């Protein structure tokens, strides 16, 4: 994300699974569980949408939601410029009704986008026309803080620099204990 005032959009559904996730492995030492399902037709729709929308110049940044899930993806998008932050809100926990699955689930076919307000309606309309689930999560800010509320409850309000430090130190820490 390059600037404050960008809309942050989720393409794809809210996750309903945690099996095989990095979260389960690092937090609970579990390397098992039913891995997220793969729907190749749905994945192709997402990839075709991304190619078309990037080619049109309507997307400023994109990040897949894979290892670590939604929360890791959004923080990684903010690391390039620690003066930026984001103010995000998700209306519900989704199908799983679990906060951990929402934040750390690694379901396939999901991407975060940063889009200018000028292109927001075009991107939303294009996703809907392509049959993709899409929701605006919030906007980038110049606060240097990541704020996230879920179902009306604030669950995170932290400095991006602090999140980056935790993220960067966790990799060597986990490697020393694997």
Predicted regions span which residues?
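Mobile "lid/hinge" segments at catalytic clefts and subdomain interfaces of large enzymes
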Residues: 1-40, 51-54, 108, 116-119
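Glycine-/charge-enriched secondary-structure boundary and capping motifs
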Residues: 32-33, 47, 53-178
């Amino acid at each position: 994300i390059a600037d404050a005032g960008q809309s942050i959009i989720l393409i794809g559904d809210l996750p309903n699974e945690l099996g095989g996730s990095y979260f389960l492995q690092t937090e609970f030492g579990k390397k098992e569980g039913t891995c997220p399902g793969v729907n190749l037709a749905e994945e192709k729709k997402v990839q075709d949408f991304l190619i078309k929308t990037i080619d049109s110049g309507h997307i400023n940044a994109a990040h897949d939601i894979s290892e670590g899930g939604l929360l890791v993806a959004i923080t990684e998008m903010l690391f390039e410029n620690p003066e930026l932050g984001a103010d995000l809100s998700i209306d519900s926990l989704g199908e799983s009704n679990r906060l951990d699955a929402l934040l750390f689930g690694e379901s396939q076919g999901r991407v975060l986008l940063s889009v200018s307000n000028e292109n927001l309606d075009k991107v939303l309309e294009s996703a809907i026309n392509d049959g993709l689930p899409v929701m605006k999560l919030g906007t980038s800010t110049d606060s240097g803080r990541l704020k996230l509320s879920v179902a009306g409850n604030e669950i995170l309000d932290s400095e991006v620099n602090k999140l980056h430090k935790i993220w960067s130190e966790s990799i060597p820490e986990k490697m020393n204990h694997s």
